[in-house]
């Protein structure tokens, strides 16, 4: 007798299997809906989101709305994306800085520049950050090929007048130092394109001589003590980006429309009560960020949805600082907070640029909760 062969009806087996698959998928869908409606699942999601925000250093005010956690916010994702982008940029910068024309220095072990630097006058770029260096030596004038001076987050208290002899200088970044003034000789650097003096906290004015800087397209003097827009800034005819947020401005000059090329204007965290009609003459302005706490008069056309202008009004309720002492720790804490604010706003502005339908008027409400 040969082998016994059992023949199945394949169509019956397939129908049985497909029925079971459909039942399993229906059960999965029903279970997913149950979990979605479950308060415990929502609480777990919010708790995980809050924990992640805290690890990233995002303040509570940015992900809470009216006392509720907003897990749909894209800010955390944006900050993470920016962090990855910055890391990638740093790798590229590091490769670039291996050039014999680039000098790089960082770390709190450095209290002054190395003596050997004086002999390397061929250098074109300095990248010095997060050190305890307080003084930039006068021999900097020997570096006639210098194009970039990137000196953020040090302890620099003053810049030498000799900096004005760097005729090829294009970028100067002295943000988050301890500067109280800028030398008028900087106005002799006629090829300067970018100037960043943000986060020095006590800087109150820029010298009139900087009016000579006709190539400047970017100025950041945020987080200082400016009570008005410096006259020299109004004479920078090619200026495209001006950040004067977190200062003591109570009004804007009536001739603000002299900045015909201005595209981005950041004014938030000041004491402005109105915006002048001259703002309407800034035809190239595409981004305007103000604090709406004190504003009582805004030209209607600025909020017109038909214009390309993104008008952002931030309504902020800062933590009460009553009783805070002006100690060194308090100053450093303020410096760190201002630095985080700038990073947050960069992420927010980049997010605005990526939206397909950008609101013409945006309000951010933040609050503090004391337990």
Swiss-Prot record:
Signal peptide positions (record): none
Keyword Repeat attributed: yes
GO biological process, one term: cellular response to leukemia inhibitory factor
Entries under PROSITE patterns matching the protein: LRR
InterPro entries found in the cross-reference section: Leu-rich_rpt, Leu-rich_rpt_4, Leu-rich_rpt_typical-subtyp, LRR_dom_sf, LRR_domain-containing
Phosphoprotein as UniProt keyword: no
LRR repeats by residue range: 122-143, 145-166, 168-189, 191-214, 215-235, 238-260, 261-282, 284-305, 308-329
Protein's UniProt name: Leucine-rich repeat-containing protein 2
UniProt organism field: Mus musculus
């Amino acid at each position: 007798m040969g082998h016994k062969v059992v023949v199945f009806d394949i169509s019956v087996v397939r129908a049985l299997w497909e029925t079971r698959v459909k039942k399993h998928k229906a059960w999965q869908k029903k279970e997913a809906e149950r979990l979605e409606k479950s308060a415990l699942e929502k609480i777990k999601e919010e708790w995980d989101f809050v924990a992640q925000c805290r690890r990233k250093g995002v303040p509570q005010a940015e992900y809470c709305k009216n006392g509720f956690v907003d897990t749909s916010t894209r800010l955390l994702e944006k900050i993470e994306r920016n962090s990855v982008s910055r890391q990638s940029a740093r790798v590229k910068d590091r490769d670039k800085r291996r050039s014999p024309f680039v000098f790089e220095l960082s770390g709190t072990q450095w209290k002054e520049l190395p003596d050997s630097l004086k002999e390397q006058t061929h250098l074109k770029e300095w990248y010095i950050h997060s050190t305890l260096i307080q003084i930039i030596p006068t021999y900097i004038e020997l570096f006639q090929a210098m194009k970039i001076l990137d000196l953020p987050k040090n302890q620099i208290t003053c810049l030498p007048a000799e900096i004005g002899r760097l005729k090829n200088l294009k970028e100067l970044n002295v943000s988050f130092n301890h500067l109280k003034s800028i030398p008028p000789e900087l106005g002799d650097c006629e090829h300067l394109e970018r100037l960043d003096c943000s986060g020095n906290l006590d800087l109150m004015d820029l010298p009139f001589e900087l009016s000579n800087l006709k190539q400047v397209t970017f100025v950041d003097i945020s987080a200082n003590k400016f009570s008005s827009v410096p006259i020299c800034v109004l004479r920078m005819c090619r200026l495209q980006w001006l950040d004067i947020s977190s200062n003591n401005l109570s009004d804007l000059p009536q001739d603000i429309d002299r900045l015909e090329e201005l595209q981005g204007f950041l004014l938030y965290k000041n004491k402005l009560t109105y915006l002048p009609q001259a703002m309407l003459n800034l035809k190239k302005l595409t981004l305007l960020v103000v604090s709406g706490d004190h504003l009582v008069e805004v030209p209607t056309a600025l909020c017109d949805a038909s214009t390309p202008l993104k008008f952002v009004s931030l309504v902020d309720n800062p933590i009460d600082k009553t009783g805070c002492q002006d100690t060194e720790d308090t100053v450093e804490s303020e410096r760190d907070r201002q630095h985080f604010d700038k990073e947050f706003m960069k992420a927010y502005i980049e997010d605005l640029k990526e939206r397909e339908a950008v609101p013409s008027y945006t309000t951010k409400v933040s609050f503090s909760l004391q337990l």
